């Protein structure tokens, strides 16, 4: 290489690498910096910011404060909110005092939520993570299998949590993981299985160590595991696990234990609503032994010492869910219609009709959005084209029941019914 060619080669003023050794070289007044040095500087600044944030920890809200914040997003379920507020407060109080040397070591208390579909189990867990500003991940127990079998490995749950916090291991250690449909991995009988149960008892065994606390080896950035790879080591001892499930027919096991109701010819004949109310009362009496009879192994039940139940939402609760929370469905659709310069008004009879349909479909609060979305589909499809001159749209029970179209109120009219164009 000639001396002239050497003079033409540019070098990073910080690491000394040439322009051929790096992807990009940025020029400044008499200096050059490469992309690798820029990335390194960003990493140093990010680490300092994390350290400063860790040093100035936010004040942990008290149980009543947590309860009040849950009230802003979750309607009803007062007992469950109280239990969760205390459990979460104690968990993070325990984490905040771990550095202090003390002879008493406080064990982690994971939580089991029992309640019908759409009663608010997932929302409660999500809202807790939002209140406490900690990473949160959801896993579906029905997709999990033992390691080595086709399906999702239980350690993938930790990977989901890492993804939520940009693979910050220290932050992930303080997160919350919600495992839904936990009742679906119950074994069929309460006696040990003689055959391999890949998605039932086997998954419970695989989850045991993870929930209690172990060091999980997770591939970086979501890659697949292979022998030559360096893994991220994540200690799960401080991760709060909340498990949830409907536990259908659990009340029958509790009924046999408590022997509250007669059977056979002497049994009292009661309406369907009474059976539902009685089942709800029985579920509140759930004990660890009932869960073992249901099909959860004793060791797994032992890792979930806090058990709380959620009630089935009635019509009044569903109507309140539509309007009261910060992110209530009615408020969301009002905002969507505001973007088009149109006001939308849901009358009380419409809210009642939506709630009734959700109860009929047995979807609880989870089904409310799909009912409203289906009802407003044609209207939202045509709205951008007809919004000019339109001031207000009124939704009543007739619209929900598909018996009549919405009421359109124009700026120059009082009220008229218009059929959305098909």
Curated annotation (Swiss-Prot):
> ClpX-type ZB domain: which residues?
1-53
Q: Pfam family example for this protein?
A: AAA_2
Question: What SUPFAM superfamilies does the database record attribute to this sequence?
Answer: Glucocorticoid receptor-like (DNA-binding domain) (SSF57716), P-loop containing nucleoside triphosphate hydrolases (SSF52540)
Q: GO MF annotations for this entry? A: ATP binding; ATP hydrolysis activity; ATP-dependent protein folding chaperone; protein dimerization activity; unfolded protein binding; zinc ion binding
Q: Where is ATP annotated to bind?
A: 116-123
- Assigned keywords, A-Z: ATP-binding, Chaperone, Metal-binding, Nucleotide-binding, Zinc
What biological-process GO terms show up in the record? cell division; proteolysis involved in protein catabolic process
Gene3D superfamilies xrefs: 1.10.8.60, ClpX chaperone, C4-type zinc finger domain, P-loop containing nucleotide triphosphate hydrolases
Family statement:
Belongs to the ClpX chaperone family.
Its quaternary organisation is: Component of the ClpX-ClpP complex. Forms a hexameric ring that, in the presence of ATP, binds to fourteen ClpP subunits assembled into a disk-like structure with a central cavity, resembling the structure of eukaryotic proteasomes.
NCBIfam families, alphabetically?
Answer: clpX (TIGR00382), PRK05342.1 (NF003745)
Annotated function: ATP-dependent specificity component of the Clp protease. It directs the protease to specific substrates. Can perform chaperone functions in the absence of ClpP.
Q: What is this protein called?
A: ATP-dependent Clp protease ATP-binding subunit ClpX
Source organism of this protein record: Coxiella burnetii (strain RSA 493 / Nine Mile phase I)
Biological classification of the source:
Bacteria, Pseudomonadati, Pseudomonadota, Gammaproteobacteria, Legionellales
């Amino acid at each position: 290489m000639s001396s002239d060619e050497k003079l033409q080669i540019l070098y990073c003023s910080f690491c000394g690498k040439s322009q051929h050794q790096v992807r990009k070289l940025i020029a400044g007044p008499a200096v050059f910096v490469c992309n690798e040095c820029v990335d390194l500087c960003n990493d140093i600044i990010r680490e300092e910011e994390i350290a400063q944030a860790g040093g100035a920890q936010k004040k942990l809200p008290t149980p009543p404060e947590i309860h009040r914040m849950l009230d802003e997003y979750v309607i009803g379920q007062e007992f469950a909110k109280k239990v969760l507020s205390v459990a979460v407060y104690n968990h993070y109080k325990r984490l905040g005092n771990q550095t202090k040397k003390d002879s008493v070591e406080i064990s982690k208390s994971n939580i089991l939520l029992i309640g019908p579909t759409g009663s608010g189990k997932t929302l409660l867990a999500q809202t807790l993570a939002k209140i406490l500003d900690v990473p949160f991940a959801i896993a579906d127990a029905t997709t999990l299998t033992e390691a080595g079998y086709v399906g999702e490995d239980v350690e993938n749950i930790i990977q989901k949590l890492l993804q939520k916090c940009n693979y910050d291991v220290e932050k992930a250690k303080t997160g919350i993981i919600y495992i839904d449909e936990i009742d679906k991995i119950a074994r069929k009988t309460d006696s040990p299985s003689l055959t391999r149960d890949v998605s039932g008892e086997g998954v419970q065994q695989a989850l045991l160590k993870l929930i209690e606390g172990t060091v999980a080896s997770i591939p970086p950035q979501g890659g697949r595991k292979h022998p030559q790879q360096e893994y991220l080591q994540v200690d799960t001892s401080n991760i709060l696990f909340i498990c949830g499930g409907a536990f259908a027919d659990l009340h029958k096991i509790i009924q046999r234990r408590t022997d509250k109701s007669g059977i056979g010819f002497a049994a009292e004949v009661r309406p369907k609503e009474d059976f539902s109310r009685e089942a709800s009362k029985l579920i509140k009496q759930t004990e660890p032994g009932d869960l073992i009879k249901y099909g959860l192994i004793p060791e797994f039940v032992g890792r979930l010492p806090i058990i709380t139940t959620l009630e089935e939402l009635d019509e009044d609760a569903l109507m309140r869910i539509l309007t009261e929370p910060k992110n209530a469905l009615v408020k969301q659709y009002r905002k969507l219609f505001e973007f088009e310069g149109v006001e939308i008004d849901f009358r009380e009879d419409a809210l009642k009709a939506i709630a009734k349909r959700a109860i009929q479909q047995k979807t609880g609060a989870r089904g409310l959005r799909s009912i409203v979305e289906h009802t407003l589909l044609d209207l939202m499809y045509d709205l951008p084209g007809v919004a000019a001159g339109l001031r207000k749209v009124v939704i009543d029970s007739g619209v929900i029941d598909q018996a009549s179209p919405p009421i359109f109120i124009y700026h120059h009219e009082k009220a008229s019914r218009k059929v959305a164009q098909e």
